[in-house]
Amino acid sequence: MNKEKLSDHLKSEWKKIDQTANPSIPNQKELLHQLSQMKAEYRKKLLQEIILFVFCALMVVSAAILAFTQAPAVFIVLQVCVLAVLPILIAAEKKRHLGECEVKRG
């Protein structure tokens, strides 16, 4: 009999939880709005990455041309600097990638 009371008590508590934790289901308009916001954020991030890539590519090409034509020592210093910064960039990219994998609620 003790198990039956416990079972009934748990069932009643579960019903209370179900009643209080009733999630709201968004309508089609809200879903479309959320989707358009996510697409806009994606486009903005993509554009930022493309601009950053082009800027970095131009800087690298300019520095390489300068190093090859003006001073080979500058080219060697540039290579050392890149090797020093590369682990930091890799760590930042891994951290950013892990942050994107987490589930965002809001």
From Swiss-Prot:
It is found in: Cell membrane. It comes from the Bacteria. InterPro entries: DUF5345. Induction: Expression is sigma Y-dependent. Induced upon nitrogen starvation. The chain crosses the membrane at residues 46-68, 73-92. Keywords: Cell membrane, Membrane, Transmembrane, Transmembrane helix. This is Uncharacterized protein YxlC. One of its GO terms (cellular component) is plasma membrane. It is a multi-pass membrane protein.
